[in-house]
Design a protein with these regions (language model features):
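Alpha-helical recognition/docking segments in bacterial nutrient-uptake
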Residues: 1-44, 48, 105-108
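Short glycine-/acidic-enriched loop or helix-start segments at secondary-structure transitions
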Residues: 3-7, 27-28, 47, 66-67, ...
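Glycosyltransferases and closely related glycan-assembly transferases
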Residues: 7-14, 74-75, 124-133
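Hinge/beta->alpha junction and helix N-cap segments in small-molecule ligand-binding domains
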Residues: 21, 31-41, 56-101, 114-122, ...
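A conserved helix-loop-strand patch within extracytoplasmic ligand-binding domains
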Residues: 46-54, 113
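Short polybasic/polar patches that bind polyanions
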Residues: 47, 78, 84, 129-131
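Short acidic capping loops at alpha-helix termini that bridge into adjacent secondary structure
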Residues: 52-54, 83-86, 133-141
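Flexible loop/turn connectors
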Residues: 104-207
């Protein structure tokens, strides 16, 4: 992505923060969900259920959160399962794109799919059920975000809960402190907030 606007703001000593987009070369604090922690929790949960053919369906890895998810997934799959070339599909964060890419994951033998967003999870479930398969009877699915109503689906979606209120309030507080500071100096810092795995009805034992 183009970093010029960030450097221009820093040169003008205009305080700013970033959210879920950390870049070491950007002189500003970033407030992010611990994507790696969330992916690790998701893989560990599926591994405990007996899954070894686990796939990741995420966004394009030029986007920072998607890259962090893919890197963490590759690492934890190697550590827990010994799979050093795991199944990863990159696509857009849309229902339609996820639905289309789910076919490739199933063709490669995935019995569980971790997605980069709840919307992607819904797209994956749509494809799975359209093929006459069940969630979680045949395929387990995990989302990421824990957006509104995910607990009211059938099955309710197992997902990674992002602590959005904490992230936003901390980012706003930091920004106002910088605006009040008479000696403001643009400085990079990372503030990582731990997500939580919310286990619901879309994950089950491998068969």
């Amino acid at each position: 992505s183009d970093l010029a606007p960030y450097h221009d703001a820093a040169a003008r000593e205009i305080p700013f923060v970033t959210i879920n987009g950390t870049r070491p070369e950007v002189p500003a604090p970033d407030f992010s969900t611990g994507d790696a922690l969330g992916i690790r929790a998701a893989v560990a949960h599926l591994h405990e259920l007996g899954h070894t053919r686990i796939a990741l369906l995420t966004g394009r890895t030029h986007i920072v959160p998607a890259l962090r998810k893919a890197e963490a997934f590759t690492q934890v799959m190697g550590e827990l399962i010994g799979d050093h070339s795991p199944i990863i599909e990159e696509t857009f964060y849309t229902y339609e794109a996820a639905a289309a890419h789910t076919h490739a994951l199933l063709e490669r033998g995935a019995t569980a799919i971790i997605t980069g967003s709840d919307l992607q999870a819904l797209g994956a479930i749509r494809t799975i059920t359209s093929l006459g398969l069940s969630v979680p009877g045949d395929i387990s699915v995990i989302g990421f975000d824990d957006t509104f109503l995910m607990g009211h689906l059938d099955p309710a979606l197992t997902t990674i809960h992002q602590p959005v209120p904490s992230i936003v309030s901390s980012a706003v507080r930091s920004l106002f402190e910088a605006l009040r500071a008479p000696d403001y100096v643009p400085t990079h810092a990372d503030y990582v907030f731990s997500p939580d795995l919310i286990v619901r009805g879309s994950t089950g034992h491998a068969h």
